[in-house]
Every structure is written in C-alpha cells, then in structure tokens.
C-alpha cells in the first residue's frame, strides 16, 4: 500500500505542474490599479478605510493626574493587606510566592476568586512588606 502511494506521488511530481495554467501574471502593474490619495479615501473606492481621517480631538477636557498617584494603592486594598499582614508575614518567612499562597488558600476551602484576590494582595505586599504592618 505504501509503495502505491509512493509511486503515485513520484508520478505526480514528474508529470504534474503546480502552477495554474489559466492565470496570466504580468510584472507590470496596471495603471488602473494606481489611485491618488484623495480617491482612496472615498468610501465608494474602499469598503473599509485603512487611514484615519478624523481631526485630532481637543484634549483640553481630559482628566489629568500625576503618574505617582496612578500607582498608589486603593485604601481598601491597603486595609485588606494590613488585615492579612500576619498571614502574609508567615508566608514571607516560608519564602512563598503568590502562586504558593493561591494554592494554599484554595486548598483550605476558599473559592477560586477569593484565593486569587488574596494572592494578588500578597503580590502587592511583597513589594514593600514594611509598609503594611498590622493594626
């Protein structure tokens, strides 16, 4: 059976042609395919616009803040980390990573989303453990 497929493949490579015979290709680009920029922007020419034509919107009404304030933790997160700081310090003494905390919390019977939230809080705790001393 393998010999039959092998002979069929060899005969196809010898006799067959991979190029289509009904397509004529020309190295010269047709002048009808070249369009000006203005014509290309018309919706009739292109069903989808690829270039942005909108004017730049005014950015005066954007809400701006300092970059340092963007990275500050939410007060709720800080309170939650301080509440869990004794547990987090025990994990830190065992040199546990966030996935270890997630695994241990999940195995102790908490739901997945609670374990994920606690492991995310532990990740933030690891950045500066001294800042989150307990109450």
Curated annotation (Swiss-Prot):
A motif (RxLR-dEER) lies at residues 48-64. One of its GO terms (cellular component) is host cell cytoplasm. GO terms for biological process: symbiont-mediated perturbation of host small GTPase-mediated signal transduction. It comes from the Eukaryota. Keywords: Host cytoplasm, Host nucleus, Secreted, Signal, Virulence. The keyword Chaperone does not apply. Residues 1-18 form the signal peptide. The keyword Cell membrane does not apply. Effector that promotes P.infestans virulence and suppresses pattern-triggered immunity (PTI). Interacts with the host ubiquitin E3 ligase NRL1 and enhances the association between NRL1 and SWAP70 to promote proteasome-mediated degradation of SWAP70, which results in the suppression of immunity. Interacts with host ubiquitin E3 ligase NRL1. The RxLR-dEER motif acts to carry the protein into the host cell cytoplasm through binding to cell surface phosphatidylinositol-3-phosphate. The C-terminus (residues 126 to 135) is required for the interaction with host NRL1 and the ability to enhance the association of NRL1 with SWAP70. This is RxLR effector protein PITG_02860. It comes from Phytophthora infestans (strain T30-4) (Potato late blight agent).
């Amino acid at each position: 059976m393998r010999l039959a497929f092998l002979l069929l493949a060899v005969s196809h490579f010898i006799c067959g042609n991979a190029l289509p015979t009904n397509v004529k290709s020309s190295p010269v680009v047709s002048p009808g395919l070249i369009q000006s920029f203005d014509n290309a922007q018309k919706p009739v020419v292109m069903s989808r616009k690829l270039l942005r034509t909108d004017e730049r919107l005014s950015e005066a009404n954007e809400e701006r803040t300092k970059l340092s304030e963007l990275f500050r933790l939410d007060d709720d997160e800080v309170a939650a980390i301080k509440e869990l700081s004794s547990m987090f310090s025990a994990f830190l003494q065992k040199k546990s990573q966030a996935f270890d905390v997630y695994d241990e919390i999940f195995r102790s019977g908490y739901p997945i989303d609670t374990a994920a939230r606690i492991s995310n809080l532990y990740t933030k705790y690891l950045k500066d453990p001294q800042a989150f001393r307990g109450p």
